[in-house]
Amino acid sequence: MEQLKEKFEPLFSVLPQVKSPGYRVPFREKLKWTGIILVLYFFLAQIPLYGLSANAVDQFAQFRAVLAGNFGSILTLGIGPIVSASIILQLLVGGKILKLDLSRHEDKAFFQGLQKLLAIVFTFFEALIFVLTGSLAPSAPQFVWVLILQLTIGGILIIFLDEVVSKWGFGSGVGLFIAAGVSQEIIVGAFNPLSAPTQPGVPAGRITGFLYLLFTGQSPDFQYYVLPVLALIAVFLVVVYAESMRVEIPISMGGGKRLSRGAVGKYPLRFIYASNMPVILTSALLLNVQLLANVFQKLGYPILGTVSNGQAVDGLAYLLTAPRSIDALILDPFRVVFYAVVFIGLCVLFAWLWVEISNIGPRHVARQLYQMGMQIPGFRSSRGQFEKILKRYIPTITILGGAFVGLLAFVADLTGSLGGGTGVLLTVGIVYRLYEEIAQEQLMDMHPILRSFLGD
């Protein structure tokens, strides 16, 4: 492991990086940087790819919410390379192939450097695949490398924008870009006043179209106009309720200066313990299956399935394509069941990996609580006792939470939710966590004495 570090660390030193703040970033400054990056993201998403064919079709539209990219712009790749790099490293660390202890500063810094390097490699690799397989067809052969260069630059810009948000803003850039893209898609999908080519004169927005047909005495299609909006509302309510669910472990102060000895409180464990990361990672993994299906078909070996007009029509790639209509339950039940089992299973796997790698597993939480001088009433104060009790709860809620978000995303996709079921699920969770972080930061700015207690 030490030899690997010696080989890679010189590379990390030459990679550009966003400087970490040497002080606690105030609330207003975090808000400023988050706003600036959001404006930059929307601006870059409107810069078109020079040399792209006018007939190019978004073959990965079903993953667009998770990619947080805008097809046809320099941000077409979105956060795909970042998440793909994260998947590879999580599997390597989780499988003990890379023996890193991410609670140690040195190992965590090495992990982050390796992730950035791998994300840049994936940016070029995915740009190459998108262009050479025809997913982003050039208008002329001489524009092939021009397109690859533009996509690579856009992907690298996303990597550094994400780093700015993570260090200077609220939440993470990955979450911010997903929420921004899906929110835009929901607003346009619901209220677009322009008519679609398939229905001249009828507004393309689900709500505007429904009202137009209603007021002109026509009968709106329930499954097309109403069901996606109802599914959107249902997913929103379920996610908000699930985010508020907690398993609370009673704790008390075993001594110390900050609080009086014996003060009793509760340590909350979220039901969705791994947040929405399992869904992001699972969706990104399935996207890579579709990409590889295109590559193998281009090479003349369609081992993952046949791709026609950018869509998998058979094989494993087809089975791992999300069903987007309730009709699929009747027309292709095997595919629906197969996809559901794989999707939910992967969400559980990534939930477990994320908990271990993010240092929120029983061992790390036990050490944190013990170092704060906490104890559980009725038990002796020891790190081992903390870990033993937390092991009763954290693994269980990790598995249940991962399965829950996977099932919810699958069902929401099946109903054709406005903004995409997975996209809505991710956005609601991201915005909810962002709201909590903003509220906490504002509270600490108003009451500085709370900073030490909240661990800042």
From Swiss-Prot:
Entry annotated with the keyword Coiled coil: no
Function according to Swiss-Prot or TrEMBL: The central subunit of the protein translocation channel SecYEG. Consists of two halves formed by TMs 1-5 and 6-10. These two domains form a lateral gate at the front which open onto the bilayer between TMs 2 and 7, and are clamped together by SecE at the back. The channel is closed by both a pore ring composed of hydrophobic SecY resides and a short helix (helix 2A) on the extracellular side of the membrane which forms a plug. The plug probably moves laterally to allow the channel to open. The ring and the pore may move independently.
InterPro entries linked: SecY, SecY/SEC61-alpha, SecY_CS, SecY_dom_sf, Translocon_Sec61/SecY_plug_dom
Compartments where located: Cell membrane
Domain of life (superkingdom): Archaea
Annotated membrane topology: Multi-pass membrane protein
Signal peptide: none
Pfam families for the chain: Plug_translocon, SecY
Extracellular side: 49-59, 135-141, 192-224, 298-334, 417-419
GO BP terms: intracellular protein transmembrane transport; protein targeting
UniProt-recorded name of the protein: Protein translocase subunit SecY
Keywords: Cell membrane, Membrane, Protein transport, Translocation, Transmembrane, Transmembrane helix, Transport
Single GO cellular component term: plasma membrane
Keyword Cell membrane among record annotations: yes
Gene3D superfamilies associated with the record: SecY subunit domain
Subunit record text: Component of the Sec protein translocase complex. Heterotrimer consisting of alpha (SecY), beta (SecG) and gamma (SecE) subunits. The heterotrimers can form oligomers, although 1 heterotrimer is thought to be able to translocate proteins. Interacts with the ribosome. May interact with SecDF, and other proteins may be involved.
Family: Belongs to the SecY/SEC61-alpha family.
